[in-house]
């Protein structure tokens, strides 16, 4: 990218406000109130560039269809509870409890291993009641292929025990009727369920416009200059959720995650921000990285 092109694109996105931060300019707790990036236009450009390269990731296509359906129909929450708390059937629309457990099993492991762990859990314990009544060691054995089996088994068991004791049934469908903040409060009561897990449940299973920050999203956001290099994940989550338009959050998040997993150019840029990488033909984010090199 030429210097003139860099200047033109940088001006287009207007990276930082010239107004010094003070109490009146802090955007409701935004940790970086003077950082204007990412702009809505930049988010759209990055989304479109990654969509052209990858297409929409097929592993997230079903969640995308559920989002589209949810915006055009109102669910009967009680009916869903009666149906979805009984079995772990992959052919049905994923329940909130299924989704939460899947996300927990995906922590600190590969996607294929977490999928194998959930499939093994389903095969061993067809109903959530079976999991609740099982010995922790049996749950560990069922999910061992996903890694951290003792820790994850305890977490799953704690969730089920709390649901049974406090609500009388193993179901999280009631979360569909709550606001984002109410969902965060409810899920934070479960030991082992952290902010990223909650955000993933909000986006994938509850169809809220939330933007989870996993390792791939976090590192690319820093490399793009969307947050400072010194940012942590919590501040990145707050900033990106305030700056990225709601209508772009789901697609952009899925695409950044997918791209971060497979793009060697982005891995170089994350490791060494000033490293020379290939052309935009190989990675469409190269031109965006050029803005901050």
UniProtKB/Swiss-Prot annotation:
Residues 1-10 have a biased composition (Basic residues). It comes from the Eukaryota. It is an enzyme of class 3 (hydrolase). The active site is at residue 196. Residues 1-34 are annotated as: Disordered. SUPFAM superfamilies: DNA-glycosylase (SSF48150). GO terms for molecular function: catalytic activity, acting on DNA; hydrolase activity, acting on glycosyl bonds. Pfam families: HhH-GPD (PF00730). Its EC number is 3.2.2.-. Keywords: Glycosidase, Hydrolase. GO terms for biological process: base-excision repair. InterPro entries: DNA_glycosylase, HhH-GPD_domain, HhH_base_excis_C. DNA binds at residues 108, 151, 216, 232. PANTHER family: HYPOTHETICAL BASE EXCISION DNA REPAIR PROTEIN (EUROFUNG), PTHR47203. Belongs to the DNA glycosylase family. This is Putative DNA glycosylase At3g47830. It comes from Arabidopsis thaliana (Mouse-ear cress).
């Amino acid at each position: 990218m030429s210097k003139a092109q860099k200047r033109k694109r940088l001006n287009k996105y207007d990276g930082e406000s010239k107004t010094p931060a003070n109490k009146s300019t802090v955007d409701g707790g935004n940790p970086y109130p003077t950082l204007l990036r990412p702009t809505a236009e930049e988010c759209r450009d990055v989304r479109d560039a990654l969509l052209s390269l990858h297409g929409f990731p097929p592993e997230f296509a079903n969640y995308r269809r559920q989002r589209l359906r949810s915006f055009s129909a109102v669910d009967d929450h009680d009916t869903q509870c009666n149906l979805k708390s009984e079995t772990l059937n992959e052919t049905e629309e994923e329940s909130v409890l299924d989704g939460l457990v899947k996300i927990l099993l995906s922590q600190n492991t590969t996607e294929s291993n977490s999928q194998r762990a959930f499939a093994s859990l389903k095969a061993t314990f067809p109903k959530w009641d079976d999991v609740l009544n099982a010995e922790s060691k049996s749950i560990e054995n069922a999910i061992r292929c996903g890694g951290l089996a003792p820790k994850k088994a305890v977490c799953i068991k704690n969730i089920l025990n709390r649901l049974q004791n406090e609500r009388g049934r193993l179901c999280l469908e009631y979360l569909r009727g709550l606001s984002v903040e109410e969902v965060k409060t409810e899920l934070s009561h479960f030991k082992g369920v952290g902010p990223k897990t909650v955000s993933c449940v909000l986006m994938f299973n509850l169809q809220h416009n939330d933007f989870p920050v996993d390792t791939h999203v976090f590192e690319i956001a820093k490399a793009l200059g969307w947050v400072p290099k010194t940012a942590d994940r919590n501040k990145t989550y707050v900033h990106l959720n305030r700056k990225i338009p709601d209508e772009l959050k789901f697609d952009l998040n899925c695409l950044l995650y997918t791209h971060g997993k497979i793009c060697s150019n982005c891995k170089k840029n994350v490791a060494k921000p000033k490293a020379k990488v290939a052309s935009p033909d190989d990675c469409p984010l190269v031109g965006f990285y050029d803005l901050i090199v």
